[in-house]
Amino acid sequence: MKNFFYKGNKKIQQRMLNYGMEWAATHGKVRTFICCYTLGGTASLKLYQKAYQNEKFMIMALCSYLGNIQINNPWESLNPYTMVQNKEKFLPLKFSEETQYFYI
């Protein structure tokens, strides 16, 4: 599957970020702080695997998931609660117990 990224499309980036922040804010007490270089479009399994090794890909994959526009999502059961329970799997994202946010 071809991956594509909306590096130049600010409208789509903003829409995804707004949707992602709204989704994170309305799903329980755990909030997800998103800071990214670019927002991903579709995300393949290979991209998600790269996410574990490169924080840029991690943030793109997370934004893509929260934006809910990706195809064949291998993390379809992912939600902020499971992210907290399995924080070590989401490194290099740092989880703050005090603020309940994930940070780069």
Swiss-Prot record:
Family statement: Belongs to the asfivirus MGF 300 family.
Query: What function is annotated for this protein?
Result: Plays a role in virus cell tropism, and may be required for efficient virus replication in macrophages.
Protein's name according to its UniProt entry: Protein MGF 300-3L
Q: Give the source species.
A: African swine fever virus (isolate Tick/Malawi/Lil 20-1/1983) (ASFV)
